[in-house]
Amino acid sequence: MTEQATTTDELAFTRPYGEQEKQILTAEAVEFLTELVTHFTPQRNKLLAARIQQQQDIDNGTLPDFISETASIRDADWKIRGIPADLEDRRVEITGPVERKMVINALNANVKVFMADFEDSLAPDWNKVIDGQINLRDAVNGTISYTNEAGKIYQLKPNPAVLICRVRGLHLPEKHVTWRGEAIPGSLFDFALYFFHNYQALLAKGSGPYFYLPKTQSWQEAAWWSEVFSYAEDRFNLPRGTIKATLLIETLPAVFQMDEILHALRDHIVGLNCGRWDYIFSYIKTLKNYPDRVLPDRQAVTMDKPFLNAYSRLLIKTCHKRGAFAMGGMAAFIPSKDEEHNNQVLNKVKADKSLEANNGHDGTWIAHPGLADTAMAVFNDILGSRKNQLEVMREQDAPITADQLLAPCDGERTEEGMRANIRVAVQYIEAWISGNGCVPIYGLMEDAATAEISRTSIWQWIHHQKTLSNGKPVTKALFRQMLGEEMKVIASELGEERFSQGRFDDAARLMEQITTSDELIDFLTLPGYRLLA
């Protein structure tokens, strides 16, 4: 075991190789990763620069819109390459981080697909990222098991769910591996290692290397992924279209480019997904300079609001026209041990999923196995003997306009809502910088999107000098006062021992910095990553 940085070609690894690393960072795997990093990092950096330029244009008054130059793609008659047999039925998908016990429980749940997450529900500390790759390799090979401290053994049942791997977004670095002195893209690290170690075993059992792509903002980013996938297929002599991806439409710029995104990735894409929580965060962030587009309390921004309903319907219409799946969004509720409260939770999930299924979505997301039966029953009811709803074209819909997609929604900004935002965001940030990205808070399974909505909402209320429903103006001073008060509430709710052992001071400091800074910080996970091992 060496202490100095290990260099292979042009990649430098800042961590020593332990037993876990040796299993994943084999010479052949690192050679493939090196090729991807050297081929594709320069263009990825240009794509990130283009994001900054686009945001500056929006800040200066140019609202997002459909692209006139690509009208021919939108108007032409074309379809994606196709959907593999084991992805034709995705009526319920469960998501969760790539932790060993969670991987087993998710694959065993009453669902069709498990999205194993290296992104928003995993705090990417080095050991967790490496262990995650080991866990997925063992899951693909069918050998994964886990024994807890009490001696309970977890292992896979026959016919587990289909596995899809969500890689990190384009903006996230993997700081423990550098190329030319810079941290490499986390997305390429996650993709290269999962693909390299698993494509043969996946194909041998009639599945394939399937991916979820997060936080895309443009068709050019989708085209970049298409080139990455095609390179990997050619490198290992695989037919074009072996790698399949589902792409999350969870940024405001991307909703105006869904046809173009599907077209750019047409050999590899099988569907789009309504990443609704990140989409709300992106709406706030993208339109941060517009005082007439400030959102109310997070709790008031529901899928029946016009701008979100338009987004859901346009996604379904666009996907089905092109032969691609239109996946619904996340139900983040956690089942309750109290029967009456649990019935309320399940009724909310049922209503939410019924709206999606009736709109024409092909499937939906849950964050907890205890919701699987409820979500499954809703989609079974609507689907009947069908595997999906690809034939639901929504041709009766009037064309959805940019104005509808950008329309702000009504609702109050309340003191109670602002205080709840503070408590949720601080608790989430504390968990994330402690290495846990998937956190139960007040009956919801929260990931980074929730904290992002919370802190950007308050930033925007301060920035535009909004008032709360009780007449109090939202200022930095009011926020700081509430932050101090809510820290005491968190301490009393969690108990002194948990509070004092945690990293709540660090979390509050980061929350204060990103909420009161003059410029809105792009993603809290970027400064958060500096506080992670």
UniProtKB/Swiss-Prot annotation:
InterPro entries: Malate_synth_C_sf, Malate_synth_sf, Malate_synthA, Malate_synthase_CS, Malate_synthase_TIM, MS_C, MS_N, MS_N_TIM-barrel_dom
Catalysed reaction, written as an equation: glyoxylate + acetyl-CoA + H2O = (S)-malate + CoA + H(+)
GO MF annotations in UniProt: malate synthase activity
Enzyme class: transferase
Annotated catalytic residues: R166, D447
Superkingdom of this protein's organism: Bacteria
CDD domains documented for this protein: malate_synt_A
Listed GO CC annotations: cytoplasm
EC number: 2.3.3.9
Annotated localization: Cytoplasm
One Pfam match: MS_C
One GO process term, biological-process aspect: glyoxylate cycle
Annotated pathway: Carbohydrate metabolism; glyoxylate cycle; (S)-malate from isocitrate: step 2/2
Record-annotated disulphide pairs: none
Main location: cytoplasm
Alphabetic keyword roster: Cytoplasm, Glyoxylate bypass, Transferase, Tricarboxylic acid cycle
Signal sequence, renumbered to the chain: none
PANTHER family (alphabetical): MALATE SYNTHASE, MALATE SYNTHASE 1-RELATED
Family according to the record: Belongs to the malate synthase family.
Full protein name: Malate synthase A
Annotated organism of origin: Escherichia coli (strain K12)
